[in-house]
From Swiss-Prot:
Keywords: Hydrolase. This is Deoxyguanosinetriphosphate triphosphohydrolase-like protein. GO terms for biological process: dGTP catabolic process. The keyword Hydrolase applies. PROSITE patterns: HD. It comes from Deinococcus deserti (strain DSM 17065 / CIP 109153 / LMG 22923 / VCD115). One of its GO terms (molecular function) is dGTPase activity. Gene3D superfamilies: Hypothetical protein af1432. InterPro entries: dGTPase, dGTPase-like, dNTPase_2, HD/PDEase_dom, HD_domain, PHydrolase_assoc_dom. HAMAP family: dGTPase_type2.
Length: 380
């Protein structure tokens, strides 16, 4: 059986000198005994996996409402499947670059915990509703979840994750990215990779994006050139082949460009990598241009598609009604949320409660507090 010190020694012997080592962790906010058989980052990862917030990601929107499209929503990606895909990419690239795989996957598993129901539409609604109370941001909410809202241990609030993991969440918000660990930078890059590839795939699967529209996209045209003989119209088999090729292409570019950037930077330690003024986990210049145009394409043809915009309208109606109902009648809140209101104030407690809901639970709660014949609006 390997002890924690054995695992730490293995890291030191096999990882590159600029990787973040578990034995060099900056510790936790609340001192506690470390595991005898797990590294500090393995312990972080396991704590995140067992949270309620992580389980709820299964029923939260990525792009398509989790309960929409006549039952076909089961085939589209959710926040959970997106998170697992980011984890896989981050771990794979970390392995190839000699970075700390466990820290990278822990940050990846944690980075989307703060998303509310209804995806980015829900985030915009909550941010507007909380305008006078500090706003709402899913990255900030993820940190709030792991430091305060998940109550699983008697000796401290939250999960008491290492400061290294928590800093990875800060850096996912892009503030001061030059001072992030390479593992945190990697998760940020893997997130962009995953949602670009997978949103294109889901857009095609749903029919909201057509192959004809994709001909406008430089990324797609170059992808087709890499898979000669692709038929038109696309079959489901060919779509899967193209998706697999796109993922592999993006991962190879990220790995190779990052390795080159690290070598050219001359960094020799994790501290030097954090202090380096430029992002070292990066894509080639050509790929950055392709991804930038892909983001513009997705905004125009998928995220602003009228069927997706209908979800935005639904999110606004449901979340606004819930927020006003809870703030007008705090007795509607469950006991745990009511208790938080004493410390963080009613608006923030209401926001925390709503942000933790799944799509389905938000819809069911909305229906319960606005039954047929009841008033459809609550006091502002």
């Amino acid at each position: 059986m390997f002890s924690r010190t054995d695992l730490e020694a293995r890291e030191a012997a096999t990882l590159c000198p600029y990787a973040t080592l578990s034995r060099d962790t900056r510790g936790r906010e609340y001192p506690e005994a470390e595991s005898a058989t797990r590294t500090a980052f393995q312990k972080d990862r396991d704590r995140v996996l067992h949270t309620t917030a992580f389980r709820r990601l299964e029923a939260k929107t990525q792009v398509f409402l989790n309960v929409s499209y006549s039952g076909h929503a089961d085939h589209y990606r959710t926040r959970l499947t997106h998170t697992l895909e980011v984890q896989q990419v981050a771990r794979s690239v970390a392995l190839n670059l000699g970075l700390n795989e466990t820290l990278a996957e822990t940050i990846a598993l944690t980075h989307d915990l703060g998303h509310p129901p209804f995806g980015h539409a829900g985030e915009r609604v909550l941010n507007a509703l909380m305008h006078d109370h500090g706003g709402f941001n899913h990255n900030t909410q993820a940190r709030r979840i792991v430091t305060h809202l998940e109550s699983r241990y008697p000796d401290f609030p939250g999960l008491n994750l290492t400061l290294d993991t928590l800093d990875g969440l800060n850096k996912h918000d892009r503030a001061g990215i030059g001072h992030a660990s390479l593992e945190a930078q990697l998760v940020d890059a893997a997130d962009a990779l995953a949602y670009t590839a997978h949103d294109l795939d889901d857009g095609l699967r749903s029919g909201l994006i057509t192959p004809a529209q994709l001909q406008e996209l430089p990324l797609w045209r170059e992808l087709l050139a890499r898979v000669p003989g692709t038929p038109a119209p696309l079959t489901s088999r060919e779509r899967r082949i193209l998706h697999r090729e796109l993922l592999g292409w993006l991962i190879r570019d990220l790995t190779q460009a990052s390795a080159q950037a690290i070598a050219q930077s001359g960094v020799q330690t994790a501290a030097e990598a954090r202090a380096y003024p430029e992002r070292l986990m990066t894509y080639s210049g050509a790929m950055r241009d392709l991804l930038r145009s892909a983001g513009t394409f997705l905004r125009e043809h998928l995220y602003r598609h009228w069927r997706v915009e209908m979800q935005v309208e639904q999110a606004e109606r449901v979340l606004t009604t819930l927020f006003r109902a809870y703030t007008a009648r705090p007795s509607l809140l469950p006991p745990a949320a009511s208790a938080r209101a004493e410390h963080s104030g009613l608006p923030r407690a209401v926001c925390d409660h709503i942000a933790g809901m799944t799509d389905r639970y938000a819809l069911e709660t909305h229906a319960a507090i606005t039954p047929p014949g009841a008033p459809t609006s609550w006091p502002h």
